[in-house]
Amino acid sequence: MASRYDRAITVFSPDGHLFQVEYAQEAVKKGSTAVGIRGTNIVVLGVEKKSVAKLQDERTVRKICALDDHVCMAFAVLTIFIGLTADARVVINRARVECQSHKLTVEDPVTVEYITRFIATLKQKYTQSNGRRPFGISALIVGFDDDGISRLYQTDPSGTYHAWKANAIGRSAKTVREFLEKNYTEDAIASDSEAIKLAIKALLEVVQSGGKNIELAIIRRNQPLKMFSAKEVELYVTEIEKEKEEAEKKKSKKSV
């Protein structure tokens, strides 16, 4: 009896579960860790980079992409299965088409919430249709609207979405989120560089080998998505390490 609810997408179990949706959410928890932070004049996206094959071109393995000139997205997928990475590609392509269609019809760009709601609605439809399965992705969607205010939304495989000041998704989301809850303050995002460093610090809580395993991007108002090179990320990591050393020295002096 239990296996029937386990396999059916559109049938609730007696205790109110949609197991296929819950399995998709578990798949997301095994994906790369991604973090998004709203600054005053900037939004930062950071993603844990998984190691690639020796002969593979790492430029083709991206977790951050632009949906429109003012909206971008990072996603967490179970990268060991290419099918779920392909899920992200389908959602990205649908969202990009919707951005362009909206611009042609209304003659205005989409708002960040509009495209987030579109993606969430698409995901939700795949939780109540026979012959389909839920998308195995969770996404952080960021950008700026005409009012100049930065936005950050998160969606999950069930089709729900929420606005955040800072959030994390993926395998170590809980650890990163706890770090952000302790360290996200107005001072921590007062400048662009401080917001960038906060995102890197959050990822360094769970990422091994420092900056070389971090993919970082920022978006500013009226500016396109900017991807950081590995060298740029390493410079920030070096600066963070120096700040830690100086803080430890000050503590040791006080204790003496």
From Swiss-Prot:
PROSITE patterns: PROTEASOME_ALPHA_1, PROTEASOME_ALPHA_2. Keywords: Differentiation, Nucleus, Proteasome, Spermatogenesis. It is found in: Nucleus. Pfam families: Proteasome (PF00227), Proteasome_A_N (PF10584). GO terms for cellular component: cytoplasm; extracellular exosome; nucleus; proteasome core complex, alpha-subunit complex; spermatoproteasome complex. InterPro entries: Ntn_hydrolases_N, Proteasome_alpha, Proteasome_alpha-type, Proteasome_asu_N, Proteasome_sua/b. One of its GO terms (biological process) is proteasome-mediated ubiquitin-dependent protein catabolic process. Its main location: nucleus. Component of the spermatoproteasome, a proteasome specifically found in testis that promotes acetylation-dependent degradation of histones, thereby participating actively to the exchange of histones during spermatogenesis. The proteasome is a protein complex that degrades unneeded or damaged proteins by proteolysis, a chemical reaction that breaks peptide bonds. Required for 20S core proteasome assembly, essential for the degradation of meiotic proteins RAD51 and RPA1 at late prophase I and the progression of meiosis I during spermatogenesis. Component of the outer alpha-ring of the 20S proteasome core which is composed of 28 subunits that are arranged in four stacked rings, resulting in a barrel-shaped structure. The catalytic chamber with the active sites is on the inside of the barrel. Interacts with canonical subunits of the spermatoproteasome, including proteasome activators PSME4 (also called PA200) and PSME3 (also called PA28-gamma). Interacts with proteasome-interacting proteins chaperones, ubiquitin ligases and ubiquitin specific proteases. Belongs to the peptidase T1A family. NCBIfam families: PRK03996.1. This is Proteasome subunit alpha-type 8.
